[in-house]
Amino acid sequence: AERGLLPAEATIVVAQPTALDPSRAPKGKAILWIQLQELPRDGQLRGDAAGRIEVPADGRWTPQVRDAYADRIIDRLCHHIPNLRQVIIGRHVIGPGDLPGLNINLVDGDPYSGSCALDQFMLWRPAGSMGGQATPVKRLWHIGASTHPGPGLGGMSGYLASRAIG
């Protein structure tokens, strides 16, 4: 992602929300949720590491790039789920170019709410002087991916804030 390339073999996160909540799909059906962790941000797309998908000169995620890359991911999953293509009855693909329209905090499609460099992560998130979830405003607490301990930790910042509040 840092080089602006579509990974030839992406890190893939797969979940089945209907395994815990069958009401999320029609009876007898299921949802397969797929998340890719390391894609170039919108406007920073420079090429395809596998050399198979053409990307626009402006580096933006187009529907064509998004869908072609989704096809690559499905092809890879088919190695582990042989009948996957035959059982797909619909799909909804959201790419980095779509994310800011869904959540204003996902600037340029960055799902991590900013840099995850060492000086912007863990105790230094959002700033070393902030002291975790506390803010300079009395009784205002900061939670979410932009705060300690960072993105991808399923509500941990809210848990830490609730413990600090008592």
Spans of model-derived segments:
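Surface-exposed beta-strand edges and their flanking turn/coil or helix-capping segments
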Residues: 26-29, 46-49, 103-104, 114, ...
